[in-house]
Structure formats: C-alpha cells, structure tokens
C-alpha cells in the first residue's frame, strides 16, 4: 500500500520537475563512467527515488538546479555512489537548508540554481570529494571539450540508469544557442552544448565540467527529444553566481 501511495505522490510531483514545455534534462549516447571517477557527483532523491543530480562544492554544500526542489519535498543527498542499487561506499545525508536563488523564475528558467546545505559534513575520501568552481565572470570559449554525467534516462521516454553515465560535449556559440531558443535563453546566465551524447530527463542539476572545473548546472532541453540538435541542452553558467554562492554560505548557519 505504501509503495502505491509513494508512486502516486511521485506522479503528482513530476509536473513540477518538468515544469514547462522544455523539461529538465540521464545521459543519452554516453558510456558508463569509471566507478568513482567523479566523486563530486551526488544523487538527489525523494522518497528513495532519484529525481535530480547535484555536485559537492564543499564538505557541506551541494549545488544543483532550483527546479529540482518542490517546497513540499524533503530531499536526501546520496554521496559516494556509482550504482544506486548498491550501498557500498555511499552515504545518505539529509538537507538542512534549501536555498533557491532569490530571483529564480520557474516560468522562464532564469536563475535556475540552488544551494543545499547538508545536515552534516561529508567524509572526504577516494569516493567523495568536491569539485572546484570557476572564478568570477570566468567564461569558456565556444567548441571547448567538456563533459556531463548523471543517472537519468538513457533515451527519450527510456529507463533511468542505475549506474552513473557520462558523455563528452562541446560548448556551443552563444549567438547560435540564442537563435535556437529565442527569449528563453539568456546569454548572461546560460550556455548550450552540442555533441553526439548529452543530457536527458532526471539529469537536471548535474555539473557541466570543463578542465576539471564545474562551469555549468544542467537546466533544461527539448521535452520531445533528449539531446535534440534543434533545441540544444541548456546550462546555467556558474561564474556569474560566485558572489551569491559565497555570500549565501557566509550567512547560512
């Protein structure tokens, strides 16, 4: 009975997780990541189900997408995981504070970034580490080789992956991305990628990684086709938010 109730509750919240025509974006046309090669990756879960990715930026802080949290939810962060079916090397940690960007706009995707302060500090080891962030206003050139990872769907309307998947992507020219997405796209806040592989549903909140630095947060893509060449995946640029991230964690107890 409880399983049925949980599934019904999850179904009722899915519209919030895919809040517009451009849904939140597992990895398509990718490969299984080498176990624990991305120790900063976390699975964000609700009632034991993976709903988003995130990444450690300190021993007590996770960065993810703002749309990954509905205010009625109590989320759990799983660190140190590769296969979500296995508990070895992983740890489940509660969230103490949910801090969506104050200017987050659910309808237009703007400022779709959120900090999670954990209830306890993670234990740093070979399976759990944080990833560096860019400097203020630091940008990445078009065509730069980067990568994405997650436990989301393996194809459009397909199953989610139990094991962490990854794919290489390239940074798209900003003007081209703006042309594809129109007013939905903000050149100041966002960036796009292109490539054979890419993000899909339930990869939201994971990092776009370039040169071992997290430079973006997976935000949205085409709801009809994962990793669509016509509507490329969009990421929130982290560099403009560095002052907010630092200021927020100075003020959070």
Regions from the language model: what does each represent?
Residues 3-36, 122-130, 137-144, 176-179, ...:
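Extracellular/luminal ectodomains of metazoan preproproteins built from arrays
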Residues 37-39, 72-74, 90-93, 111-113, ...:
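Extracytoplasmic
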Residues 1-63, 75-81, 86:
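Protease-domain processing segments flanking chymotrypsin-fold serine proteases, especially trypsin-like
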Residues 28-29, 78-123, 136, 182:
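Conserved catalytic-core segment of clan PA serine endopeptidases
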Residues 76-86, 132-138, 168-174:
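Short edge-strand/loop segments of extracellular domains
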Residues 99-105, 121-164:
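Active-site substrate-binding loop(s) of clan PA
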Residues 33-37, 56, 69-70, 87, ...:
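Extracellular/periplasmic catalytic domains that process cell-envelope and extracellular macromolecules
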Residues 41, 45, 144-253:
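Extracellular trypsin-like serine protease catalytic domains
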